[in-house]
Amino acid sequence: MLPKPLFDLALKLQYFPGVGVRSSQKLALDLLELEPDKYGELLEALSSVRAQIKFCAQCGFFAEEGAASGLCDICRDARRKPKQICLVEKPTDVLTVEKSEIFKGHYHVLENLISPLDNVFAEHTTLGALVERIKTLLDTPGATVELILFFKAGFSGEATTAYLKDLLSERGLEERVTITRLAQGLPMYYNPDTLDQATMVRALEDRREV
């Protein structure tokens, strides 16, 4: 039986996805055995992350507090293609696409996928902000935008895609926006976190128009 402070720490470490009872207890004991200076460095790093990491004002990926215009490194990178946007469900999915090392566009984090059965609707996503972003990109005559879907293709994914198409149609943007999905070789309910680099490269290169 762990002393209460250790037990409480182990319990709170289970807030992290995938951390169960045994692994949380091991982590708690590992923290207890850290040298004082390393323990202090860890606490400082945790505090710094909470204070200094925000979400990009344009795409929703991680950005550093005080960054120019509130944008992340990707959105500020002039070498990337702003009219090629990869749609992801959560910020960590950006890291999965980036490890392909071939995607040079921008991103847009949806935060949620539409799922009426789970009481998740369009207002719980950033689709509205995405459409406004697209309108700005299309201000230039003849400009086009490609949206690359990188989220699961189950019911919630299809509902999100359908709503996005409706929004684009309502705004008269559908003729200038191409929507593509990653290669059909991916499992329908794939977990973005588990995709390796080779799989990501093939999926991006073989993407198909929706």
Question: Which residues are covered by each model-predicted region?
Answer:
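Long C-terminal interaction/binding lobes of large macromolecular proteins
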Residues: L2, F103-K104, V131-L138, T144-V210
